[in-house]
Amino acid sequence: MMQAYRTECNYRSAARLSPAELRTAAANREILQATALAFDTRRQLRFEIGGAKAVMPFAQCADGAETGAVRDIAVLTRVGRPTCFVIEGVDTDETGQPVYRLSRAEAQRMCKAEYLDGLVPGDILPCVVTHIEPFGAFCDVGCGISALLPIDCMSVSRISSPADRVSVGQQILCVIRNRDPQGRFVLTIRELLGTWAENAAAFTVGETVVGIVRSVEEYGTFVEIAPNLAGLAESCSDLVPGQAVSVYIKNILPDKMKIKLVIAVSYTHLTLPTSLSV
C-alpha cells in the first residue's frame, strides 16, 4: 500500500481499530493517529488505541528527540491533540494486556525520506498553520514537521502581523522558497496571491471599494484592497491597522505599480470577505 503523507491530524484514527486492523497497519507501516492522553513522569506520551494501552517513549516523540534536539515542551504540548505515529511493536503489561509501542519520530523520518526530500524550491504543498510569532508563522508540512513562513513572504502589501494574513489551524497552500542552514523548509505564499498587475486589473479608477488599513504613516495611510495589492491614501491619525475602510480609487499607475486612494468611510465593525480578512 502506498503511504500518503499528510499534515498531522489528517490520518486514519487508531482509536477504534480492531486488533487485527492494528496488526495490519503495523505490518504495512501505515501512519495512524490518536489523541495523546498524558505525558507522564517517565517522559513518554500515553495513548489508547483499539481499546488497549499504547506508549510513545520520549525518543520516539519527534525526529531529533533521541539526540536532544527536541525539548520537553514540544512533546508535552501534544497532550490532548491528535498525534501521528507508526506502530513499532506490542508488549504485554503485568496483567497480560497488550501495550502498543508507537513512534512519531519514525513517521516523520518516513515523511521526509519518501515525500519532503523529493520537493524542490518552487513546489507547492499543503500546510497547516500551527502557531504564530511576530516574525512569521510556523506550518506543519507533514507529520508535524515544522517549516517557517516568514512575514515578509506573506504579502507584497504591508502587514503588521502574520495574523493579518493567516490564523492558527488554517489550511493553506505554500510554495517552497528554500531551505535554511538546518535543512528545514522556508515557505512563501505571496507568489500565490497574484502579481500587482493581475490584482490591479480587477479595479477601475472612480470605483469605491472596501479595504483594510495596513499601516498609518506621517505621509499617508496604506490600505490593502486585495491580498497582494495596497494603495496610499491620506494620513489619518484616527485609523488603526486592521480597521476596515471604504476608499475611492483616485488613480492607478501601472508603470510605478502604485494606486492612489481617498478614504471615504471608516468602519468599526464590518464583516469582510475571506479574500481580504486573511
Where are these regions (language model features)?
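Hydrophobic, ordered structural segments
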Residues: 75-112, 124, 131-136, 142-146, ...
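Short boundary/loop segments of OB/S1/cold-shock single-stranded nucleic-acid-binding domains
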Residues: 8-29, 69-73, 104-121, 162, ...
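Solenoidal tandem-repeat scaffolds enriched in leucines and small polar residues
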Residues: 130, 136-188
